[in-house]
């Protein structure tokens, strides 16, 4: 075990699934299929074995937070204000963060009676392409400097205080922020914030993004596996763009497949792998739970912070 995991409890899938009584997953096969990323793989068995125990653990953390807030209120002799329970989900590009986040959104809304759950991706806090071009960092898109971290921190602060917030919307199809389009994030019982950068420190290191999280998850996998999933996703995006000239990926449909594969591999090496090794993976130990995926996308190990 490396020093990074000294303060984590390593739990096998078999042990983890025994930590929660067996119940029927509160969603159908069709619903599960509709929320998974198109190159991801997940089954109702995964929901039962991994995600229902995880939802139960989140319930424990939420109850603990509420008990502490109540005790603080007594100490300060004032009524404690209700705050959303904020969950951060991080991990590499193409590792399956979005599937995990969307699944949690459904499970939490159905596990907690009448609970409202909002889901936000930090892609909306990327600077628009034009801004990146003007700053000369379009080739650094996805790296820490390409995000408006001040806006992200401001969003988290307002959400933590129970305010409704409108945030920008990012489209992977057009590879840019969508002008004039906003996502309205309402005050909710749970807010899930998903992105490669949610555990990273902003340049203003007096305030950390993780300070706003009540629970945090890192989705992990071997580098070779993530590369394979990324290349597979890239090629599948091409198939979706065949008849869509507005798609960022449409131009690649006009190229020989060998050139496309070479380009995608170069993007992985120069951008995504570099970003993973230098900025994303080093934040892994800031998570409360690390979900490790094997080659077939199945979660085989769980690391729980002691």
From Swiss-Prot:
Catalytic reactions of this protein: (R)-pantothenate + ATP = (R)-4'-phosphopantothenate + ADP + H(+)
One cellular component term from this protein's GO annotations in UniProt: cytoplasm
Gene Ontology molecular function terms on file: ATP binding; pantothenate kinase activity
Keyword Disulfide bond: no
EC number: 2.7.1.33
Residues binding ATP, per UniProt: 91-98
Keywords, in A-Z order: ATP-binding, Coenzyme A biosynthesis, Cytoplasm, Kinase, Nucleotide-binding, Transferase
Family from the record: Belongs to the prokaryotic pantothenate kinase family.
Annotated protein name in UniProt: Pantothenate kinase
Organism: Streptococcus pneumoniae serotype 4 (strain ATCC BAA-334 / TIGR4)
